[in-house]
Amino acid sequence: MATIESRLVEMLTVPVEALGFELWGIEFVHAGRHSIVRVFIDSEKGIFIEDCAETSRQVSAVLDVEDPITTEYTLEVSSPGVDRPLFTAAQYQAYIGEDAKVQLTMPVAGSRNLKGVISKVEGQILTLNVDGKDLIIALDNIRKGNIIAKF
């Protein structure tokens, strides 16, 4: 069964791309009777507040017609930011050599929260170097992954 996030990605990719943006990813946070739908968009030129507003109007219209969410929800549209979330194998691949943190569904090496360097991505398998040790993590075991911003 497809997750709500995957259904939303399928539903919203074309409308977001029609506006000239990349649909970076979607987070669906279920909080009781109210939920949050976070839509992350990106562009080579960067993302501005007007881009978020335009995308929000378009996404809202699609969600109103398709009605995929049965609870009340708040729609948030933003850029991925400097600590960008990672959703796909291609996104992890693009950040090989960068520091990242991941929250896991099932523990790896006794932990559900890991910080390390993305060292390899093969298919749907991520290798994260944590304290000098390579840990193998299935991407479908990652609940949430983010780049750790360096300043």
Swiss-Prot record:
The keyword Glycoprotein does not apply. It is found in: Cytoplasm. One of its GO terms (cellular component) is cytosol. Its main location: cytoplasm. Pfam families: DUF150_C, RimP_N. InterPro entries: Ribosome_maturation_RimP (IPR003728), RimP_C (IPR028998), RimP_C_sf (IPR036847), RimP_N (IPR028989), RimP_N_sf (IPR035956). Keywords: Cytoplasm, Ribosome biogenesis. One of its GO terms (biological process) is ribosomal small subunit assembly. Belongs to the RimP family. NCBIfam families: PRK00092.1-1. HAMAP family: RimP (MF_01077). Required for maturation of 30S ribosomal subunits. This is Ribosome maturation factor RimP. It comes from Shewanella denitrificans (strain OS217 / ATCC BAA-1090 / DSM 15013).
